């Protein structure tokens, strides 16, 4: 279920009886690309990876690039599950027993209520609770100025060196900080901040959409390369969960320790892998 929504995936671990294996499932859930991250993957693959080959093959190459990220996420999920089961969460593996109960007529209204109220509206309410303040923060840092410079530009400049060290940039890092409430706003936030860096008035705290060709031109003009796009695809897979998922993890585990581990572990993976990819890319290019 994590491929649809990581928060829903965390809730779905309630069916696991073993507390140890439930924790492992919760921690590795973030390695599934949720709905909010597919847009970033597809856009980067289309604009930067697909353009490396003949246009007849560009769609196939773009698709394979996205599939590769998904496979990497699955591989890291298996690896992390194995690592946790040998270190922090040692213990005997439980057995899965499938019991077929007697047939009963479906309880339509009860199922509808449970699915709509308990599964959908509560998660949606949490998302709205975190997303509304995020919109206010994005607007404020873009429109509050000190010494003729907006707070957003100040943050970008201070994050830029670390971002370039990872094969990313300050815009991407700030966008992910601002987009903690929802992965869906990562690309609009990147475009807004990039427009701000380039000196366009369109980006003053307003999330906007534009054509793919204009996006490619804007990103290229601000120094983006194929390496930047690849690392963004990797970082989109390997970064902290959104705030709704973090809150849901805490609600399910009732533990600040495991919530912190589930939040920080993907970020550590992201930093390490982006750094290694950047070093290898620079060596062979």
Where on the chain are the PLM-derived regions?
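Alpha-helical transmembrane segments
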Residues: 62-80
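Juxtamembrane/interface segments at transmembrane-helix termini
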Residues: 80-95, 146-147, 250, 281-285
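Juxtamembrane inter-helical linkers in multi-pass membrane proteins
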Residues: 1-8, 90-115, 163, 194, ...
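Final/C-terminal transmembrane alpha-helix of multipass membrane proteins
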Residues: 261-281
């Amino acid at each position: 279920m994590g491929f649809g929504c990581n928060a829903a995936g965390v809730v779905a671990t309630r069916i696991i009886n073993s507390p140890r294996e439930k924790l492992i499932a919760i921690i590795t859930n973030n390695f599934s690309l949720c709905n909010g991250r597919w847009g970033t993957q597809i856009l980067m693959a289309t604009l930067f990876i697909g353009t490396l080959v003949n246009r007849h093959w560009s769609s196939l190459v773009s698709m394979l690039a996205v599939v590769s990220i998904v496979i990497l996420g699955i591989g890291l999920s298996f690896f992390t599950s194995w690592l946790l089961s040998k270190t922090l969460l040692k213990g005997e593996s439980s057995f899965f027993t499938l019991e077929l109960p007697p047939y009963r007529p479906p309880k339509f209204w009860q199922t509808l209520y449970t699915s709509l109220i308990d599964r959908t509206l509560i998660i949606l309410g949490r998302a709205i609770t975190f997303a509304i303040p995020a919109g206010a923060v994005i607007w404020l840092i873009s429109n509050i100025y000190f010494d003729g410079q907006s707070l957003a530009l100040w943050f970008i400049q201070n994050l830029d060196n670390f971002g370039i060290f990872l094969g990313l940039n300050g815009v991407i890092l700030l966008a992910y900080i601002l987009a903690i409430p929802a992965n869906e706003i990562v690309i609009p936030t990147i475009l807004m901040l990039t427009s701000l860096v380039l000196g366009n008035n369109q980006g003053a705290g307003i999330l906007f959409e534009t054509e793919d060709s204009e996006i490619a031109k804007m990103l290229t003009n601000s120094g983006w390369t194929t390496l930047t796009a690849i690392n963004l695809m990797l970082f989109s897979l390997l970064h902290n969960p959104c705030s709704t998922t973090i809150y849901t993890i805490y609600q399910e585990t009732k533990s600040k320790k495991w919530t912190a581990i589930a939040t920080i572990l993907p970020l550590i993976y992201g930093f390490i892998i982006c750094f290694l990819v950047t070093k290898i890319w620079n060596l062979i290019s």
